[in-house]
From Swiss-Prot:
Cofactor note: Reduced FMN (FMNH(2)).
Alphabetical UniProt keywords: Amino-acid biosynthesis, Aromatic amino acid biosynthesis, FAD, Flavoprotein, FMN, Lyase, NADP
Physiological role: This reaction introduces a second double bond into the aromatic ring system.
Binding positions for FMN per the UniProt entry: R125, S126, S127, N238, A239, G278, K293, P294, T295, S296, S297, R319
Organism lineage string: Bacteria, Pseudomonadati, Pseudomonadota, Gammaproteobacteria, Enterobacterales
UniProt similarity note: Belongs to the chorismate synthase family.
Organism: Escherichia coli (strain UTI89 / UPEC)
Keyword Lyase (UniProt): yes
Region forming the signal peptide: none
Required cofactor(s): FMNH2
Source taxon at top rank: Bacteria
Protein name (Swiss-Prot/TrEMBL): Chorismate synthase
HAMAP family from the UniProt entry: Chorismate_synth (MF_00300)
GO CC field: cytosol
Subunit relationships: Homotetramer.
Length: 361
């Protein structure tokens, strides 16, 4: 299982399972001399952690991160940073009934086909519990980007089911349990979630993440284009089934005269490209969207098979999110931060001396 690392110069490797003793990660490539404490990481972990509202799973994990290495006297040393979060609220007995049954829509079937066995407790390595370490590592990247380059990364929920959410007020995102930027839609979201809970069903969502202050020039054509790496990072998040950069699939209905981001002496006049042209950042806001499927961990009966090939009826027990998109917001922010920090370090390594007279806005 070699796919546990992301990044080239800023590298994040995670380990751990949903019901194991702990989750952890190794973060390589952090420059020395950056002030860093566990409190710097805890804020985003608290935004992601389970059991914080009635709309998410009631598994209660404090997600208290420990810095094991790479920090001395409050600053980074330039060596590998080891991070650890202990699992404290596992209820593995909830999953004993699915030991030999493949939950439809989950990774049970594919993991067993690949490895010949699987950790059925909460999905094991395939669980979104793993993303806690991505958020911890991403918090390091967010701190570096903000303090060294003035880059701000923000995410929000922009659709739940058939309810579109307009980005009206970023300040509202942290004031409600949905990460919703549209205060007029909070009641509708609450009503939908109550209905889903009553029905024992789930719903999909769309999350948008925006990076402001990104300098022009990030991205490594042709295979490590910035948008390609962002798409790769976001698609690696559990339940994500689609990623768009800028206008994404909406460009299909546009003409070239509409879609091109014209430039005047005052700067770009639009941002259909989402801040990336030719795989390289343009200096505009980087905008990405991701679509998350509705979780299959529901109490609505469904058909599946067991490992003996027998058809059985499946009802998933345990503690699950009726809409996984809610807690995906800080995860999306973290993954975008990881990619941007990696590309900033790569740009600095190759092109630190490049100077141009081309205007920047």
């Amino acid at each position: 299982m070699a796919g546990n690392t992301i990044g080239q110069l800023f590298r994040v490797t995670t380990f751990g399972e949903s019901h194991g003793l702990a989750l952890g990660c190794i973060v390589d490539g952090v420059p020395p001399g950056i002030p860093l404490t566990e409190a710097d990481l805890q804020h985003d972990l608290d935004r992601r952690r389970p059991g914080t509202s009635r709309y998410t799973t009631q598994r209660r994990e404090p997600d208290q991160v420990k810095i094991l290495s790479g920090v001395f006297e409050g600053v980074t040393t330039g060596t590998s940073i080891g991070l650890l979060i202990e699992n404290t609220d596992q209820r593995s007995q909830d999953y004993s009934a699915i030991k030999d049954v493949f939950r439809p829509g989950h990774a049970d079937y594919t993991y067993e086909q690949k490895y010949g066995l699987r950790d059925y407790r909460g999905g094991g390595r395939s669980s979104a519990r793993e993303t806690a370490m991505r958020v911890a590592a991403g918090a390091i990247a967010k701190k570096y980007l903000a303090e060294k380059f003035g880059i701000e990364i923000r995410g929000c929920l922009t659709q739940m089911g058939d309810i579109p959410l307009e980005i009206k007020d970023w300040s509202q995102v942290e004031q409600n349990p949905f990460f919703c930027p549209d205060p007029d839609k909070i009641d509708a979201l609450d009503e939908l979630m109550r209905a889903l809970k009553k029905e024992g069903d789930s719903i999909g969502a769309k999350v948008t993440v925006v990076a402001s202050g990104v300098p022009a020039g990030l991205g490594e054509p042709v295979f490590d284009r910035l948008d390609a790496d962002i798409a790769h990072a976001l698609m690696s998040i559990n339940a994500v089934k689609g990623v768009e950069i800028g206008d994404g699939f909406d460009v299909v209905a546009l003409r070239g005269s509409q879609n091109r981001d014209e430039i005047t002496k005052d700067g770009f006049q639009s941002n259909h490209a989402g801040g990336i042209l030719g795989g390289i950042s343009s200096g505009q806001k980087i905008i990405a969207h991701m679509a998350l499927k509705p979780t299959s961990s529901i109490t609505v009966p469904g058909r599946t098979i067991n490992r003996f090939g027998e058809e059985v009826e499946m009802i998933t027990k345990g503690r699950h999110d009726p809409c996984v998109g809610i807690r995906a917001v800080p995860i999306a922010e973290a993954m975008l931060a990881i990619v941007l920090m990696d590309h900033l370090l790569r740009q600095r390594a190759q092109n630190a001396d490049v100077k141009t007279d081309i205007p920047r806005w």
